[in-house]
């Protein structure tokens, strides 16, 4: 399975959808290509928080720290947690194989 990893999306009702996803794409891109409801209003340009996702701590700790720009956008996210990230900023790597991504029940699109 070279070049692909397993990603499990956990939808707000607890339903799980596991997909095989190419390394190098973002969580936002994978969600869209699998018809999952993750908005991404700014199309990954770090101008909104509508692709806010919640990760399990094990995988959150494998990521590089969020940039200041991502942290600023996360401050606007509805239901922010200690392991919240923006789906557009999580690029899949081999070490993220098996990642579980919780899709929050609601997002907030704040236009400045």
Curated annotation (Swiss-Prot):
<keyword id="KW-0411">Iron-sulfur</keyword>
<dbReference type="InterPro" id="IPR001041">
    <property type="entry name" value="2Fe-2S_ferredoxin-type"/>
</dbReference>
<feature type="domain" description="2Fe-2S ferredoxin-type">
    <location>
        <begin position="5"/>
        <end position="107"/>
    </location>
</feature>
<keyword id="KW-0479">Metal-binding</keyword>
<dbReference type="GO" id="GO:0051537">
    <property type="term" value="F:2 iron, 2 sulfur cluster binding"/>
</dbReference>
<comment type="function">
    <text>Ferredoxin are iron-sulfur proteins that transfer electrons in a wide variety of metabolic reactions.</text>
</comment>
<dbReference type="Pfam" id="PF00111">
    <property type="entry name" value="Fer2"/>
</dbReference>
<keyword id="KW-0813">Transport</keyword>
<feature type="binding site">
    <location>
        <position position="48"/>
    </location>
    <ligand>
        <name>[2Fe-2S] cluster</name>
    </ligand>
</feature>
<dbReference type="GO" id="GO:0009055">
    <property type="term" value="F:electron transfer activity"/>
</dbReference>
<dbReference type="InterPro" id="IPR001055">
    <property type="entry name" value="Adrenodoxin-like"/>
</dbReference>
<dbReference type="GO" id="GO:0046872">
    <property type="term" value="F:metal ion binding"/>
</dbReference>
<feature type="binding site">
    <location>
        <position position="88"/>
    </location>
    <ligand>
        <name>[2Fe-2S] cluster</name>
    </ligand>
</feature>
<comment type="similarity">
    <text>Belongs to the adrenodoxin/putidaredoxin family.</text>
</comment>
<protein>
    <recommendedName>
        <fullName>2Fe-2S ferredoxin</fullName>
    </recommendedName>
</protein>
<dbReference type="GO" id="GO:0140647">
    <property type="term" value="P:P450-containing electron transport chain"/>
</dbReference>
<keyword id="KW-0408">Iron</keyword>
<dbReference type="InterPro" id="IPR012675">
    <property type="entry name" value="Beta-grasp_dom_sf"/>
</dbReference>
<feature type="binding site">
    <location>
        <position position="42"/>
    </location>
    <ligand>
        <name>[2Fe-2S] cluster</name>
    </ligand>
</feature>
<feature type="binding site">
    <location>
        <position position="51"/>
    </location>
    <ligand>
        <name>[2Fe-2S] cluster</name>
    </ligand>
</feature>
<keyword id="KW-0001">2Fe-2S</keyword>
<dbReference type="InterPro" id="IPR018298">
    <property type="entry name" value="Adrenodoxin_Fe-S_BS"/>
</dbReference>
<dbReference type="InterPro" id="IPR036010">
    <property type="entry name" value="2Fe-2S_ferredoxin-like_sf"/>
</dbReference>
<keyword id="KW-0249">Electron transport</keyword>
